[in-house]
Amino acid sequence: WYKIGEGSESVLESRWYEGEPIWVTAEKQGKVSATYFWPGSEAEINGKRPTYWYVFDASTSNETIIDQLLAWLDLPEGERPVFMTAYFNDANYWGHTLGPEAEGMDTVIQGLDLDLGRLIAGLTARDLLDKVNIIVTADHGMVEIDRDRMIFLDDYIDLEDVTMAGWSPVAGIIPNEGLEDSIYNSLVNVHPQLSVYKKEETPEHLHYRNHRRITPIIGIADEGWSISTRDYYNSNPEAYIGGTHGYDPDFLSMHGIFLAYGPAFKDGLIVPSF
C-alpha cells in the first residue's frame, strides 16, 4: 500500500507515481530543479530526480526551508535552480489537530505569513522579487469533525468480507471475490450521510472512475462526517476530533488558496475556482 508521510518507504517507490512532476520536466530539458519537501520528490520518477531534494522531516523549521531556497538562488548560474518547490506543514498539522475553526489557527496562519515575509525580504535583498514567479497554493482545505458525526461500516457489513484501502472520509472497499453486489447492496442508502457508489458510477465531477487502483466500491461521507468501525472508535477516544479533508471538492471548505505573483502573471487578476 502507498502511505504518505514521514518515514514511509512507499514514497520512495517510483511505481506509485504515474504523472510527470514539473521538476522531472525541467530536468528532461537540462534545467536545474530543487524541492524542499513535496509529494513524490523523494522518488526517482521516469528515471529523474530533482537536482536538489530532501527526505521529509516534519521537525524542519520553516526558517530552515526558506533559508535553503534563498541559498539555492545564491548559487552560480548552471548550479542555480530555475524551478523550486517548498512545502510547509503547519496549516495541515494544526488543522488536523485543532480543527480549522480553532482560535489557535489564527496564530498558525500569522506564523506562515511571517515566513512568507522572510522569503519576500530575501528576494528583495537580492533584487529578485520582480524577476521570479511565485505561486502560493494548498493541496486541500479543512473542515471540523467531531465524535458525534460518525458512520460505522460494521453496522452494515461483516468486515471479514472486505479489504479496506482507505477509511474516511472516502472509504475504499474491496469486496472478497463474488461479494461485490452483496456488499454494495448492504451499504447503499443505509445511512443518510453516506453516499455509496460502484467505481464506474461515481459522480463525473470527482474524476474518480477509470484508474486501476480505484476500489470497486467507494463510500463518501458528507461534509464533517467520519467513517469508522465501532471497535476503532471506542478504542481511540482522541480520534475524530479536530479537522480533516478529502470530502467532495464542491464543498467550499475543501478549496485551497492559489496566489501568484511575478512577471508571468497579470497584476490584480482574479479567476474562477478551478
What kind of feature is each model-predicted range?
Residues 8-13, 23, 55-57, 103-109, ...:
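Second-shell loop/turn segments in exported
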Residues 111-152, 219:
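Metal-dependent active-site segment of extracytoplasmic phospho-/sulfohydrolases and closely related
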Residues 28-34, 78-84, 128-133, 192-195, ...:
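Loop/turn elements at helix/coil->beta-strand transitions in domains of secreted/extracellular proteins
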Residues 51-75, 83, 105-114, 154-170:
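Acidic, His- and aromatic-enriched active-site or binding-groove loops in soluble protein domains
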